Amino acid sequence: MDYLDLGPYSSASGTVRLPGSKSISNRVLLLAALAEGDTTITNLLDSDDTRVMLDALGKLGVKLARDGDTCVVTGTRGAFTAKTADLFLGNAGTAVRPLTAALAINGGDYRVHGVPRMHERPIGDLVDGLRQIGAQIDYEQNEGFPPLRIRPATISVDAPIRVRGDVSSQFLTALLMTLPLVKAKDGRSIVEIDGELISKPYIDITIRLMARFGVNVEREGWQRFTVPAGVRYRSPGRIMVEGDASSASYFLAAGALGGGPLRVEGVGRASIQGDVGFAHALMQMGANVTMGDDWIEVRGIGHDHGKLEPIDMDFNLIPDAAMTIAVAALFANGTSTLRNIASWRVKETDRIAAMATELRKVGATVEEGADYLVVTPPAALTPNAAIDTYDDHRMAMCFSLVSLGGVPVRINDPKCVGKTFPDYFDRFAALAKA
C-alpha cells in the first residue's frame, strides 16, 4: 500500500494561501452553467471533486475554457443541450446532489453514478422532493441510493415541496438551485423542511451565491424557503472563489500545536463559509487566534501549561472542520466531547467509526455514539501509528497533525487528499519543522 511517513515535528510556522473552496467551486460552476452570459471564475479549486463536475458539465454541452485556476463558463440559459448522458461523478456529493436536481427538470435521459461509496450515500430525500414536482427518477440498485436513471418528465410546482433536513443539507441546496428554472403557480416555489436542518452555513453559501447570479431566496427561519419561479440566472461577469475554510482548519490547528505564527490567506472574517467557525472553537480551546477580512493567524496556545483546553461543543454547523477538533483533542489536558455529528456517518466514509478507530491507534480512549464522540488523550502519543484513511481526504489531512506531537506517524493512501487538496502534504511539510 502507498503510504507517507511524517514527523516527528516540534514546530509549525509560515503562511499558506488556500486553494479555492470545494463547496463554493462546484456551486458556482453549476450556477454559471445554468446562467445567461459568460462567467469568469477565478481561484477555482483543482481537485477530483471539481474535475468530475467540469467533466459532467462538458458532457452536458456546456462550453468551458480553463486556464490554471481560472475557468470561463458559457451559460446555457437554463437548459443543458445534451439530452442524453452517462455521468460518473466519483464520490462528489457537491456534484451528485445538485446535478441530479438540475437534470430532473432538463427533459432528458440521464444516468448518474459514482464510486461504490457514493452508492452507499443517501439521496432518497432529494429524489422524494423532486418526485413531488413530477420528476421521473428510478433507482438502479438500492432504493434511496445512486446509481440513478433520470427520464424526461412534465415538471410543475403546485404545492410546497417538503424535504427532510436532518440527513444532508445538500438535498435542500440542490432544490433551491434548481427551482428558479421551474414554472410554479403564483410565480414562486416554496420548500418546507421536515425536522432540524443540519449544516445551516452551507445553505447560507447556496443562498448567497444564488443572489450573486440574480436570484433572491427568502427564508423564514430555517424551516421555509421561498424561491422565485420561472426566472433566469444572470452571470455576474466575474466571481472569485474564496479559500476553502475546511482546508484552513488543518493549518490553523498546526499553528496552535506547533507554536506558529501560522497564517492562512483566502478566508477570514468576511468569509461566507461556516467553517471559519473552526477558528472560534480553536480559540475556545486556548489557541491565540487573530483574524482579518481574508486571513487568520494562530500563534500557539495561550496557557502556561502549553496544552489545549478540552472542549464540549455542538458541531452541527461545522461538521467537516469538527474532524480537525477531534484530532486536536489529542493535545488537550482533559476529555473533549463532539456532539451532534450524525452527518459524519454518511460522508466519504462513516467518519465517527473511522475517527474512533484511528484515534485509538495513537493511544486515545474514545467513546463513540450514534451522533457523538468522546476523546480522552493519552499520557503520551503512540509513535509510528499507521493511520488508515478510508479513501477519505479529511481523515488523511486531520491525522497529519499527530506528527506535531513529537512522534512520527504513517498516513496510508495519502493520495486520497486529491478529492479537495492534491498538494496538501507538500504544503504541510513546508510549514512543519523538526
UniProtKB/Swiss-Prot annotation:
Its EC number is 2.5.1.19. Its main location: cytoplasm. GO terms for cellular component: cytoplasm. Phosphoenolpyruvate binds at K22, G93, R121, Q170, R351, R394, K419. CDD domains: EPSP_synthase. It is an enzyme of class 2 (transferase). One of its GO terms (biological process) is chorismate biosynthetic process. Keywords: Amino-acid biosynthesis, Aromatic amino acid biosynthesis, Cytoplasm, Transferase. The active site is at D320 (proton acceptor). It is found in: Cytoplasm. Pathway: Metabolic intermediate biosynthesis; chorismate biosynthesis; chorismate from D-erythrose 4-phosphate and phosphoenolpyruvate: step 6/7. One of its GO terms (molecular function) is 3-phosphoshikimate 1-carboxyvinyltransferase activity. Pfam families: EPSP_synthase. It catalyses: 3-phosphoshikimate + phosphoenolpyruvate = 5-O-(1-carboxyvinyl)-3-phosphoshikimate + phosphate. 3-phosphoshikimate binds at K22, S23, R27, S168, S169, Q170, S199, D320, K347. The keyword tRNA-binding does not apply. Catalyzes the transfer of the enolpyruvyl moiety of phosphoenolpyruvate (PEP) to the 5-hydroxyl of shikimate-3-phosphate (S3P) to produce enolpyruvyl shikimate-3-phosphate and inorganic phosphate. Belongs to the EPSP synthase family. Monomer. This is 3-phosphoshikimate 1-carboxyvinyltransferase. The lineage of its organism: Bacteria, Pseudomonadati, Pseudomonadota, Betaproteobacteria, Burkholderiales. The gene is aroA.
